[in-house]
Amino acid sequence: MEKLFVLVFALTLLAFSSEASPILTEKQAKQLLRSRRQDRPSKPGFPDEPMREYMHHLLALEHRAEEQFLEHWLNPHCKPHCDRNIVQPV
């Protein structure tokens, strides 16, 4: 019983005194939260925020769709169909 107690005490002391402890100080935790994730390469020009990257992607898709729509409606070769002054877009 005494050996078990000594073993548990030694392991506990080792865990709290070593650098391999899973318990972080407040300063280390804040630094870890501030640091960027490096599990995947980050794109140049984008911060490492997946939601912001996704919103930029959606914005680019919306911009491209608007350009294609205007390209169709402002095409001079299909005048009666695409003239906004005569026909309302469907």
From Swiss-Prot:
Region described as Disordered: 31-50
Pfam families per UniProt: DUF4543 (PF15076)
Family annotation (InterPro entries): DUF4543
Compartment(s) where it occurs, according to its Swiss-Prot or TrEMBL record: Secreted
Keyword entries, A-Z: Secreted, Signal
GO cellular component: extracellular region
N-terminal signal peptide: 1-20
UniProt keyword annotation of Transmembrane helix present: no
Domain of life of the organism encoding this protein: Eukaryota
Name this polypeptide is given: Uncharacterized protein C17orf67 homolog
Organism of derivation: Rattus norvegicus
